[in-house]
From Swiss-Prot:
Gene responsible for this protein: rsmA
Recorded family membership: Belongs to the class I-like SAM-binding methyltransferase superfamily. rRNA adenine N(6)-methyltransferase family. RsmA subfamily.
Subcellular location field: Cytoplasm
Listed InterPro entries: KsgA/Erm, rRNA_Ade_diMease-like_C, rRNA_Ade_Mease_Trfase_CS, rRNA_Ade_methylase_Trfase_N, rRNA_adenine_dimethylase, SAM-dependent_MTases_sf
Any single GO CC term annotated in Swiss-Prot or TrEMBL for this entry: cytoplasm
Name this protein carries in UniProt: Probable ribosomal RNA small subunit methyltransferase A
Keywords (A to Z) from UniProt: Cytoplasm, Methyltransferase, RNA-binding, rRNA processing, S-adenosyl-L-methionine, Transferase
MF terms (GO), sorted A to Z: RNA binding; rRNA (adenine-N6,N6-)-dimethyltransferase activity
Function of the molecule: Specifically dimethylates two adjacent adenosines in the loop of a conserved hairpin near the 3'-end of 16S rRNA in the 30S particle. May play a critical role in biogenesis of 30S subunits.
Organism: Pyrococcus abyssi (strain GE5 / Orsay)
Top-level taxon of origin: Archaea
Top EC class of this enzyme: transferase
Length: 269
């Protein structure tokens, strides 16, 4: 796979573009693991973001009914169209965060790491069965962190309100060319049957002061909720559920209780 990569790069005179996060996956075992965990079968329509030189895409095409792959770099698209004769792969040119996604039921992707947050939040708004995504290890640890953990953040809370997330494989820098500066991880994302839809402005306001207790965090971030004079709602904010709990200990269910209380008192809509 490494030899094939260098051959294609040389043939087309391409140098990986670090500005758009081009780090090509070159270890077959990692590709096989991603497809195995995603449980890709002939009935599946798979979305891939960032096909690279087509190594993962090619394996997906052999196992799935249909593959949609989104790529920003026109040079890469030229290679894919010239080098492969897939009849069940559709290449979409564009920015994966901005373009409209087709319907799919599974995701298998080695995404550019700089789009990790917007990609993930866009994905979690979609209907799908499971996703296996390559992330920077640090990002994956934040996604999967539990309440009270050092890495527990707005990302952790918002992700786990909507899905079960699990690191299934840690991957070293040597699995990519060129080598990234960070280690990576494959993450399995499975949407929850009972998703908890949270007010994003409230979550942002709370996690602006993640180490403070809830009542104080809300007072100090009141402007983010459209509160012009915090004195007028001081008693309401002091009586909020879990008022004395530190923000980074809150579960999605507890944030939902806070949201419903604030909505009941017309602090948020």
């Amino acid at each position: 796979m490494r030899d094939r990569l260098f051959f294609l790069l040389s043939k087309y005179g391409i140098r990986p573009n670090d500005r758009i996060g081009q780090h090509f996956l070159i270890v077959k075992d990692v590709i096989d693991k991603a497809i195995e965990v995603a449980e890709v079968s002939k009935s599946d329509v798979v979305l891939e973001v960032g096909p690279g030189l087509g190594f993962l895409t090619d394996e997906l095409s052999k196992r799935a009914k249909k593959v949609f792959t989104i790529e920003l770099d026109r040079r890469i698209i030229e290679i894919l169209r010239n080098e492969y004769s897939w009849n069940n792969v559709e290449i979409i040119q564009g920015d994966a965060v901005k373009v409209e996604w087709p319907s799919f039921n599974k995701v298998v992707s080695n995404i550019p790491y700089q789009i990790s947050s917007p990609f993930t939040f866009k994905l979690l708004k979609m209907e799908f069965e499971r996703a296996v995504v390559m992330y920077q290890l640090e990002f994956a640890l934040r996604m999967t962190a539990k309440p009270g953990d050092r890495n527990y953040s707005r990302l952790s809370l918002m992700t786990q309100a909507l899905a079960d997330v699990e690191i299934v494989m840690r991957i070293g820098k040597g699995a990519f060319y060129p080598k990234p500066k960070v280690d990576s991880a494959l993450v399995l994302i499975t949407p929850k049957k009972d998703r908890i839809e949270l007010n994003e402005s409230l979550v942002k306001a709370l996690f602006q002061h993640r180490r403070k207790v809830v009542s104080k965090a809300l007072r100090e971030s009141a402007h983010m909720l459209g509160i012009k004079d915090v004195k007028t709602v001081k008693d309401i904010l002091s009586s909020v559920p879990h008022s004395n709990k530190r923000v980074f200990h809150l579960t999605p269910e507890e944030v939902k209780e806070i949201e419903e209380y604030l909505r009941e008192h017309r602090i948020i809509s």
